[in-house]
Amino acid sequence: MEVEERRKFGLKSLKTIDGEVGDEVIKALDGVAGDIGNYILEFAFGEIYNRKSLNLKHREMITITILLSQGGTEPQLKVHINGALNVGLNQEEILETFIQCIPYVGFPKVLNAVDLAKNGYN
């Protein structure tokens, strides 16, 4: 896939998942770390998110699980919780995703994610 095609797919995926917030992230990087914005658009959202085997709901569920597990990624986790809602996950599915993480990452990280989600739902 050519760069322009990846960029086109990336912009479409980013808009579907993150709405205007995603565009704001890319614009904020422009002039400071524009290459990172390009990698986000072309690689993450242009290539990875456009693979066929998983739908966007599954991809966002995986993404929030990874971000929750890492810790220290609260801004990105908040964006992807909203992205999960945008692609059709509901609050119950997001909470169940968090609960599934408890045995593997512990209550503190899960409670932090619940707090972010709760504030995002309101």
Language model feature labels by segment:
Residues 60, 107-108:
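Substrate/cofactor-recognition hotspot
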Residues 59-67, 97-98:
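Short, structured motif recognition centered on aromatic/hydrophobic residues
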Residues 52-58, 88-93:
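Structural motif
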Residues 13, 44, 79-80, 97:
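A general alpha-helix detector
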Residues 73-93, 109-121:
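Extended intrinsically disordered, low-complexity coil regions enriched in Ser, Thr, Gly, Ala
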Residues 1-57, 110-122:
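Acidic, glycine/proline-rich low-complexity segments that act as flexible tails and inter-domain linkers
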Residues 38-41, 71-77:
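Short acidic alpha-helix initiation/capping motifs at coil-to-helix transition points
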Residues 68-69, 87, 100-107:
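A short structural micro-motif
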